[in-house]
Structures are given as structure tokens and as C-alpha cells.
Regions:
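Juxta-kinase regulatory segment immediately upstream of eukaryotic protein kinase catalytic domains
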Residues: 1-31, 248
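Active-site flanking residues adjacent to catalytic metal/cofactor-binding acidic residues
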Residues: 53, 158, 179
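AlphaC helix of the protein kinase catalytic domain
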Residues: 124-133
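Conserved alphaE helix
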Residues: 135-146
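Catalytic-loop of the protein kinase fold
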Residues: 155-162
Length: 253
């Protein structure tokens, strides 16, 4: 690739020389934590800071032009800019460090690298998959407050799934952060939209019932109607999903 563009969060300017080398060393260095269409590695900066580097696949076909010509913002660019908005609204997401874009001789977008602070020691919501009663009630309520707060602040995460909500618990209570935030909606979030956004969570039916009931209470909506609606949408979503992907445990629908 002929050209590299780099944007660095001013707080991390002192890492510049290390960050600029990432495209050259990415194949050889770091620890792989996810492989798929995109590749994610954890790497260590010279000062010992652990960073998360996500390399987005090269856009193909019409998308190559759509993103290269700036008709639509590339995913990496959105994922670099959105945390700034979330931070201002008090919603947790890994701190963005830098964005690197490679382009070829005729200006078509190659690999994009999104570099964020690595968040360790956090749980995902996959862990409530087949959790026992008595272990998840407080978490379900806290998650409901987090989702309602986000929606009331006019922010909706379009991929609000068990793997994209990380959490930890300490003496102050539960803390949540959202990841994979390149698909967001900013603007009024209706109750129906907000409830529909909860359909992808798995776990015991009771976990979902508590989550949705509490969410409805916070947003001043009928609990029965909310639970009824989300349970139907959730069953539809997981039935479709189950036809294409194996589900690792018994899903109560």
C-alpha cells in the first residue's frame, strides 16, 4: 500500500512512533484474541500499556468505492469517533487511541486498524447463558438501568448483544462498557425501539423477564406489554439464529 493516514487521540500522542509501526508488525507480533472477517490482537506498547488492535478486512466490490470515496464513513472511522460522543454522555466504551488507514496507489481503501485501550478482567453477558437462579437477578436489573439510561440519552447500540456488553462488579455495584460500536443510532429512541433492542440477549427466561420489566419501569411503560413484546421478538430472533448457527446450551424461548 502506498499511503498511510493516521489519526491519534491527543492523549496518546507520545505513542506515535510505536503506533505508526503497527501495520508493519501486525502479522508477526501480538496475541490473537479474535479471528473472523476482522482480526483482533492484543499488543503491548513500549510503556507496558496493553492495547487492542482490530484490523478491518479490505472492503470489496461496491463497498470499496462507497468507503474509499467517503460516501459512507468506513467502520473503523465510526468506531474511532463514536467513543468521543459516548464519553461526553457518560457511557463506558474502551478509550480510542488511534486509527490507521492504508490506501493503494489509486486511493482505494486497504486495511484499517482501530487501536483502543485493552479492557481486561471484564465479563461478557454470554456467561449468563445457563446461569442458575439466584446468580443473575441483580445483574439483570443493573443492565436494564444501563440500557434505559443510554436510550434516554438518545443513543442506541444497533449490535446490542451478549458479546458486546462487558461488565464487572465491585463494591459500588455493576459497571458496563459497550464494544463494537461502529453501528449506532443517535436521536430519540422510542420505547418500542428500545425494547426491540433487547431481543438478542440470551440466558434463562427469568433473566430476560427481569431485564425487560425493570427497563419498562425506568421508561414508564406497561411491564406486561413490554415483556410480552420482547419475548415474542426474542423467540423470532433466536429461532432464526439457531437455524444458521449452533447454540451451545438449551435456550429457553
Amino acid at each position: 500500500y502506498k499511503e498511510m493516514k493516521i489519526k491519534i487521540n491527543p492523549k496518546y500522542e507520545e505513542m506515535r512512533s510505536f503506533l505508526e509501526r503497527i501495520p508493519d508488525v501486525f502479522e508477526k507480533e501480538g496475541r490473537v484474541i479474535y479471528t473472523g472477517r476482522n482480526l483482533i490482537k492484543v499488543m503491548e506498547a513500549p510503556d507496558g500499556t496493553l492495547i487492542n488492535v482490530k484490523r478491518y478486512h479490505v472492503p470489496k466490490g461496491p463497498n470499496s468505492l462507497i468507503y474509499s470515496l467517503g460516501i459512507r464513513k468506513p467502520k473503523g472511522e465510526r468506531a474511532f469517533e463514536y467513543p468521543m460522543i459516548l464519553e461526553k454522555k457518560g457511557i463506558g466504551t474502551p478509550a480510542p487511541i488511534a486509527l490507521i488507514e492504508e490506501r493503494n496507489a489509486i486511493g482505494l481503501l486497504g486495511y484499517t486498524y482501530l487501536i483502543t485501550l485493552q479492557c481486561d478482567n471484564l465479563h461478557t453477558l454470554y456467561e449468563v447463558g445457563d446461569a442458575a437462579p439466584g446468580t443473575y437477578e441483580k445483574l439483570a436489573k443493573a443492565l436494564a438501568h444501563f440500557a434505559a439510561d443510554m436510550h434516554n440519552k438518545k443513543i442506541l447500540h444497533k449490535d446490542f448483544t451478549p458479546g458486546n456488553v462487558l461488565w464487572k462488579q465491585d463494591e459500588e455495584g455493576f459497571h458496563f462498557i459497550i464494544v463494537d460500536i461502529n453501528r449506532m443510532k443517535f436521536g430519540e429512541i422510542s420505547i418500542k425501539e428500545g425494547l426491540y433492542n433487547l431481543r438478542k440477549f440470551w440466558g434463562p427466561k427469568e433473566f430476560i423477564r427481569i431485564l425487560v420489566s425493570e427497563y419498562a419501569k425506568v421508561r414508564d411503560y406497561s411491564v406486561d406489554e413490554a415483556v410480552d413484546y420482547v419475548m415474542k421478538e426474542r423467540a423470532k430472533f433466536w429461532t432464526r439464529y439457531g437455524k444458521k448457527h449452533p447454540i451451545k446450551f438449551k435456550l429457553e424461548l
